[in-house]
C-alpha cells in the first residue's frame, strides 16, 4: 500500500510573531506531524499505529483544543520577561494543567499531546520573552530561552528521592539515566538542533520535498533519540530494537531511495505487532517543523 500525502511548502522564516499567529503555527506543526504517513508505530493516515485508544481524528480534536492555549503561554512569557527565567516555570504550570484538561475533554480522557503541551508551552513562553525584550526570533535564541525556563528541572523533578512509588519518568531517570521530555527541554532541544533540523534542512534543499524531509528526519530521531515512550512500552529492549531498525534503514538510504517508503510501512507493521510507539520522537518532529520556520541565528546567543 502506497500512501501519498500532500504537504505544504515551507513558509518564509518569521522575524516577528503575534500571539494569535502562534496558535496557528503550533496547530499546523501538530497536524503536520499527525498526518505525516507512514510513521512506524505512530498514529497517521494509514492506521493508528501501536495505539488502541486513539486515532487521527482524536489527534485533530486534541489539536483544536490545545492550540488556543499557546497564546496564553506566549502572554505569560511576555508579561514576565523581566523576571529570571527559572522563576517563570512555576507560573506556566497552571496553564499547562488547564490546557491538558481541555485536551482530555476533547479526547474522552486519552493522552494524545501531554508531552507536546509541555514542549510547545515552553516554546511559546520563550517567544513571548524574546519579543518583550526586543530580541530576534531565532532558533537558537528560542531554544536558549527554553533551556533557561527549564533550568534544573531534571534534578528537581526526576532525581530527588521521594516517598511512595516512582512515576514512570522518575523510574526512567533513576534506573536508566533517561531524562525524557524534561531533559530535552533543559538542553534547549539539543536533539532537534543538532540532529533533526540539519537533516530536515538538507533534504528540503536537495529534494524540495517537505514530506520526504519529515520522514527522513523521523528516522534519524528514531535512530538516536532515547525515547522514553518506547521504554515505557518495551523496556530498554524495545528502545534498542527501534533504534537499530531505524539505523538499518538509514544505512540503506532511508526514504530517499527506491523502496524506502515501503520499508517504513514494513517497520510500521512490525512495531504495531510489538506494541512499540516512538511518541517522544514524534513530538520532537513537530518541534523540528515548528522551529524550521525561524532563522537559525547565532549558535551562542548573548
Swiss-Prot record:
Top-level division of the source organism's lineage: Bacteria
One BP term from GO: prosthetic group biosynthetic process
Which UniProt keywords are given for this protein, alphabetically ordered? ATP-binding, Nucleotide-binding, Transferase
Keyword ATP-binding set for record: yes
Q: What is its EC number?
A: 2.4.2.52
Q: Which Pfam families match?
A: CitG
Q: Which GO terms describe its molecular function?
A: ATP binding; triphosphoribosyl-dephospho-CoA synthase activity
Keyword Transferase set for record = yes
> Where do the TM regions start and end?
none
Question: What top-level class of enzyme does the UniProt entry assign?
Answer: transferase
The reaction(s) catalysed by this protein are: 3'-dephospho-CoA + ATP = 2'-(5''-triphospho-alpha-D-ribosyl)-3'-dephospho-CoA + adenine
Its family?
Belongs to the CitG/MdcB family.
Q: Which PANTHER family match?
A: 2-(5''-TRIPHOSPHORIBOSYL)-3'-DEPHOSPHOCOENZYME-A SYNTHASE (PTHR30201:SF2), TRIPHOSPHORIBOSYL-DEPHOSPHO-COA SYNTHASE (PTHR30201)
Q: What NCBIfam families does the entry give?
A: citrate_citG
What is the recorded name of this protein?
A: Probable 2-(5''-triphosphoribosyl)-3'-dephosphocoenzyme-A synthase 1
Source organism of this protein record: Salmonella paratyphi A (strain ATCC 9150 / SARB42)
Q: What lineage does UniProt assign to this protein's organism?
A: Bacteria, Pseudomonadati, Pseudomonadota, Gammaproteobacteria, Enterobacterales
Q: Which gene is the coding source of this polypeptide chain?
A: citG1
